[in-house]
Amino acid sequence: MQDTWTHRTVLLNEAIAALHINPDGHYIDATFGRGGHSRLLLSQLSPQGRLTAFDKDLDAIAEAQTITDPRFSIRHEGFMHLGQLPAASAAGVLMDLGVSSPQIDNPVRGFSFRSEGPLDMRMDTTRGQSVAEWLADASIETMAEVIREYGEERFAQQVAKAIDRRRQERGPLRTTAELAEVVAGAVKTREPGKDPATRTFQALRIFINAELEELQQALEASLKVLQPGGRLVVISFHSLEDRIVKQFIAGQSREVFDRRAPFAAPKAMRLKALGRIKPSEEEIAANPRSRSAVMRVAERTGVSA
């Protein structure tokens, strides 16, 4: 299907440069989205090069199917499944995390509090519970825990109680506008320039899609599929994601000693950290949604996974 929403790929040139492209190599775009990174990457591959992409979103799959290049293939799977590819087969893995502009701007997807739509938020609409279905039955304690942990919302308890009150008085929440209204009434202190529903919507989206758990699985899988010298490039958009990526790279970039066996040889590092990159002022001015992006880069060593 053809999107009518504008999508600008964040850190496009920087991400492809960070992959240090080998024209004959096999690359993995673990989060195809609308294909900005994939298309530029393909343009730098030789006839022998290959690109395998992953995405859970059916709209992304439809977009990917418009690419007829025989060097390209798309899998309708989340990126935690990239470990199914042959070991040490990839010269680079790229992950562009979070939700895309077309997903946010399409009211039918239910990701945004700025327009009314069904309260869904699933990346893959063919499976799993929608946010509306989950909120209909979740306890106050569970809702508060999710909103606090994944949204870092200090009014999580008040929001959860307000959702429960709304369920009791008027039935389950069905739309994004209904949820945004409930949250606005529960969050008493406003952050400058930020809608009061921002943290709750982020929390529910992350939870319903198991985003952080799947990110951890995908990072672990990248160690298996990357060949020595292969690059891992990850773009994140909020502190919860970036913390996981940062800690993973740091943990794999140092020798680890087993305290239970002090005379044993340390586990050698499996990644070499190559730093982080933020969008330029010019990119932020052209695309304000890029402001929070952080790209971290690491290189696979020859130590087995």
UniProtKB/Swiss-Prot annotation:
It is found in: Cytoplasm. GO terms for cellular component: cytoplasm. Coiled coil: none annotated. GO terms for molecular function: rRNA (cytosine-N4-)-methyltransferase activity. It catalyses: cytidine(1402) in 16S rRNA + S-adenosyl-L-methionine = N(4)-methylcytidine(1402) in 16S rRNA + S-adenosyl-L-homocysteine + H(+). Signal peptide: none annotated. Pfam families: Methyltransf_5. Belongs to the methyltransferase superfamily. RsmH family. NCBIfam families: 16S rRNA (cytosine(1402)-N(4))-methyltransferase RsmH. This is Ribosomal RNA small subunit methyltransferase H. It comes from Polaromonas sp. (strain JS666 / ATCC BAA-500). The gene is rsmH.
